[in-house]
Amino acid sequence: MQKLVIEGGKPLEGEIFLHGAKNSALPILAGTLLCDGETVLENCPRLTDVFAACRILTHLGCRCTVQEHTVTVQVRDLCADTIPEVLMQEMRSSIIFLGAVLGRSGSCHLSYPGGCELGPRPIDMHLDALRQMGAHFSVHGGQLDCTAPEGLHGAGTVSYTHLR
């Protein structure tokens, strides 16, 4: 392992503030669907994708509020298992909601993120991993219909090397 050694005449002390990262916040926001009650994310970036994720959560029946860099998600019973195409196209990473909705309700209906066609894209890794966990998929006119009739279950270790 490499290391960086800094030698200087003054000891370092103090605090720094690191901004939240979108790539961390979005999966956590999707994961709130698997929690009952309220989840509070602090230090969340104020980015278009975070607001798009909140719109998806709201459509699914959650209450999502953003105040400065704090996002609060209140999850009760989901009132929907369908994410409309217009919301799926708002961000490329909207596929991250698939597993959480499927795990919570046993079914999920959505279009491909950003309107992309089925092909060798990162979405295939999501589908393959969920298949190993008990999910079934069918495609109808650009819509992906997903079910987990017996619920999602552990699949040992799902790693990239096990996926096609």
Residue spans of the language-model regions?
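Short, surface-exposed connector motifs at secondary-structure boundaries
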Residues: 12, 34-39, 107-108, 153
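Glycine-rich, N-terminal phosphate-binding loop and its surrounding beta-alpha-beta segment
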Residues: 42-113
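N-terminal glycine-rich anion-binding loops that anchor highly charged ligand groups
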Residues: 2, 17-42, 51, 63-71
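Hydrophobic alpha-helical hairpins/lids featuring a short glycine-rich hinge
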Residues: 81-152
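Conserved small/polar residues in nucleotide/adenosyl-binding loops
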Residues: 161-162
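N-terminal amphipathic/basic leader segments beginning at the initiator methionine
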Residues: 1-9
